[in-house]
Regions:
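Helix-loop-helix junctions that connect adjacent transmembrane helices in secondary transporters/permeases
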Residues: 146-232, 398-476, 683-694, 702-704
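Extended active-site and interfacial segments that coordinate phosphate-rich ligands
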Residues: 18-22, 126-139, 219, 226, ...
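Short acidic, glycine/serine/threonine-rich loops at helix termini
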Residues: 81-86, 124-127, 225-227, 250-256, ...
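Thiamine diphosphate
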Residues: 236, 249-271, 275-277, 490-498
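Flexible, low-hydrophobicity surface segments
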Residues: 1-162
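Short, aliphatic-rich beta-strand segments
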Residues: 42, 212-216, 476-481, 636-638
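Glycine-rich loop/linker segments at domain edges
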Residues: 13, 19-22, 89, 93, ...
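C-terminal catalytic domains of large/alpha subunits in multi-subunit enzymes
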Residues: 64, 74-75, 233-238, 268-274, ...
């Protein structure tokens, strides 16, 4: 399936990342490296209250400070700019770049200071005086739905942002024929993405052309270009977005933020470049946060362990506004809940709830980790309560290999899979039977050891992509892709594909992205779709270039194009391999009008667009933990991941994505949690409070894979979010097993939480 390489030199091999040289030598170009002549610096004045009316804003002291060029408030901005983008539809309250009349979350922008120096801008921002009238905030989704709760948007008369339902099969029959019915409650905390590089923007207004050039860290350059034009009321052709190197994103650089409007507007109004770089505390406070749900799961099963059906009621904490992509993670929860199991019926309801918090958004996995968490926590706990080994319980209920393509009760059609093979390999790698023996011996000695499993399936490949491929007369290949890397290694993977397709050296391939004047239209990078969709577009463009090169080679060889073969960086006549010309020779001829047939124009360039089909990567993760019975610290004794992302282009990149995702999943399971107090003030406003795993906490991961090719041009599936989708609940399941028969409703499994659980029984 979909593997156009006979004897690849690069594809399938652990090729070191070609982009790493510039990163390790400090020659990369990140947003804060940009220094333009006459550049000004912006600082944002943010609300220190979560819910309040703005009585007045006094900017005089800030404006009089030496070096300050301008101070903008809502009344200034509203003359020139509209609303932020939303995916909420008609009638949904839309945010403005600067709050007007009311603030609805801690950190919401209320003014912007522009100065000659970054630190002058910061100091002047402290001088802007805002008088507030406090309003009662609502920071808990369940409290937000109670009668008489404070309203985030009074005009709606409710805190319900949206309701999403997903049902299928026959849930009534499933529950009516069940021998066992259980109801569980789970709470998944809000998380911050914490990319190594925070967000940033440098905008410049070209007076000669009337164009805005916006340098940014955004994941979707073409979307941001469109949003910028719409918000500022200018033609799309007057906006150019350029993204350089980006130090991580994890979904936090997808949405349309206030600064995405404010900084370009300031550059346009002042006629000088303006830079804004998000501080770490700002990143924790105002970049979109992920997860954040409360769920009740009711499950029905036969006494044999056969799952029958499920009912879900989920509350999603959307924050104060529906920004672009706020809804997506929450709607994914219901659609992917069935996971790897055959359910006869399911019905679910998810209510998106407004709270006085920063808007939610995608975070590595975007709803699929939540869905997998809910079903895997349910399955593991139900198995233990029924006295069935959790591994065997899963095997009883897996979608079988021979059942693919398999349509779930929520409407997804899984294209391929072998879930049992992945689980068996993970169990073997873990030494499952030996670990079960270790657990029993440890318990006899008063130690708390637990084993947790997780088998997952995810959906990815949502976005269409395009590519432009050009071969120069020197034989070098240039690729422009609509994808937008921020650490994944796309330049390496794409160069591998192109090098093997043409049979040339990987050093002869250059991959460019991120400039809307050069890169073709497409979906950017997110959702584990880059290689499968972006790679397919690149190969389609390569094929069109190849077809022209075959005609040129045939002309040089005085042969019929149908008889010419491209292989190993040369073109030869089928059956007469000695009649051959090299790749560079053909490329040179293709740019020489005199060397071409009359009906062939000079140049080697092709564009291709790929509209993808969904793919469904899967895997099995297993974890052994020990919980200290006195301090309740959790220590990972062993961690195993077996994942299936179809054909593998670069195993080094795959392993890097899995380890990185597993570290973030470990953070969700044991350490990370965005905390607000009752006033909506952010408690975890620094990395001293928002704890992320360090090298000390990260275990050694044992990684393996199965290979089930997907039915697409490359046979690949996504892997960028696999570990965040599968690993978290393996850890939590292991902790719950160690404390069994106690139950864990929430996460992370911090010592304080585990102590509370054990104290309350």
């Amino acid at each position: 399936l979909g593997w156009p390489f006979k004897s690849p030199r690069y594809v399938g091999k652990p090729v070191p990342r070609v982009e790493d040289r510039r990163f390790v030598t400090g020659t990369g170009l990140f947003i804060d490296d940009l220094k333009l002549p006459g550049m000004l610096y912006a600082a944002i004045v943010r609300s220190r209250m979560a819910h309040a009316r703005i009585r007045s804003i006094e900017t005089g002291r800030a404006e009089r400070m030496r070096g300050v060029v301008a101070v903008l408030t809502a009344k200034d901005v509203e003359q020139h700019a509209g609303f932020l983008a939303t995916d909420g539809g008609e009638g949904v309250p839309r945010a403005r770049p600067l709050a007007s009349g009311k603030v609805r979350y801690y950190g919401e922008p209320v003014a912007m200071v522009i100065a000659e120096d970054r630190y002058v801008a910061y100091d002047a921002a402290e001088l802007v005086e805002v008088e507030y009238e406090r309003l009662e905030p609502v920071v808990d989704v369940e409290a937000a739905l109670r009668d008489g709760a404070p309203l985030v948007h009074e005009e709606l008369g409710t805190n319900v942002a949206f309701t999403h339902r997903r049902s299928g099969g026959d849930p009534e029959e499933a529950f009516g024929t069940a021998d066992v019915v259980r109801k569980y409650r789970f709470r998944i905390q809000r998380l911050a993405a914490v990319p190594m590089e925070t967000r940033g923007i440098v905008a410049e207004y070209e007076k000669g052309t009337g164009r805005l050039v916006v340098h940014t860290t955004h994941q979707f350059p073409h979307d941001l270009r469109r949003w910028t034009a719409e918000a500022l009321g200018i033609p799309l052709s007057d906006v150019r977005v350029v993204v350089h190197d980006v130090g991580g994103a994890f979904g936090s650089k997808i949405t349309h933020y206030p600064e995405d409007v404010l900084v370009p507007l300031a550059a346009k109004l002042l006629g000088r470049p303006v830079k804004w770089i998000e501080s770490r505390s700002e990143s924790l406070a105002v970049s979109t946060q992920g997860r954040g749900i409360v769920a009740e799961v009711e499950v029905a099963a036969k006494s044999s362990g056969r799952l029958l059906g499920a009912r879900l009621k989920v509350l999603g904490d959307v924050g104060a506004y529906l920004f672009y992509a706020t809804k997506l993670p929450f709607t994914n929860v219901l659609s992917m809940f069935p996971g790897v199991y055959r359910l006869k019926g399911m019905e679910g309801e998810l209510i998106g709830v407004y709270t006085n918090k920063v808007p939610a958004g995608p975070y590595r996995g975007a709803g699929r980790p939540e869905a997998s968490y809910l079903i895997e926590r349910t399955v593991e706990r139900l198995a233990r309560e029924m006295g069935v080994d959790p591994a065997e319980f899963r095997a009883i209920n897996f979608v079988r290999r021979e059942e693919f393509p398999y349509r779930t009760v929520t409407g997804h059609t899984y294209d391929s899979g072998d879930y049992e093979a992945a689980l068996r390999k993970a169990l073997d790698l873990l030494g499952y039977s030996q670990m079960r023996g270790l657990k029993e011996r440890a318990r006899a000695e008063g130690k708390l050891v637990g084993i947790g499993l997780s088998t997952y399936v995810e959906v990815c490949n949502f976005a269409s992509q395009s590519a432009r491929v050009m071969v120069g007369e020197d034989g070098k290949v240039t690729v422009y892709t609509s994808t937008m890397p921020h650490g994944q290694g796309e330049q390496t993977a794409f160069a591998q594909l192109v090098a093997d397709f043409f049979g040339i050296g990987i050093e002869d391939v250059r991959v460019f992205y991120g400039d809307t004047d050069l890169a073709p239209e497409g979906g950017g990078t997110a959702g584990s779709w880059t290689l499968t969709s972006g790679g397919a577009a690149i190969l389609a463009a390569c094929e069109r270039v190849r077809e022209k090169m075959l005609r040129v080679a045939a002309h040089l060889l005085e042969a019929n194009p149908d008889d010419v073969v491209m292989e190993g960086g040369r073109f030869y006549v089928r059956g007469h391999e000695e009649r051959a010309v090299g790749f560079r020779e053909v490329a040179e001829a293709a740019h020489d009008e005199d060397a071409l047939p009359e009906d062939v124009e000079p140049g080697l360039e092709a564009y291709a667009f790929h509209s993808p089909k969904l793919t469904y990567p899967f895997g099995a993760h297993a974890v052994v933990v020990e919980v200290d019975p006195e301090t309740y610290q959790v220590r990972i004794l062993k961690a195993v991941m077996v994942d299936d992302c179809g054909n593998v282009v670069n195993p080094l990149l795959v392993e890097g994505q899995l380890i990185g995702g597993a570290v973030q999943a470990l953070g969700q399971a044991l350490y990370e949690e965005v905390v607000y107090d009752s006033e909506g003030q952010l408690v975890t406003a620094a990395l001293t409070d928002y704890l992320v795993p360090t090298a000390v906490e990260v275990p050694r991961f044992e990684i393996d894979r199965t290979v089930t090719p997907a039915p697409n041009p490359l046979g690949t599936k996504g892997v960028g979010e696999a570990a965040t989708i599968g690993f978290t609940q393996a850890v939590i399941n292991a902790v719950e097993d160690a404390l069994w028969p106690l139950r864990l409703e929430g996460s992370p499994a911090k010592p304080s939480y585990l102590w509370e659980v054990t104290r309350n029984g």
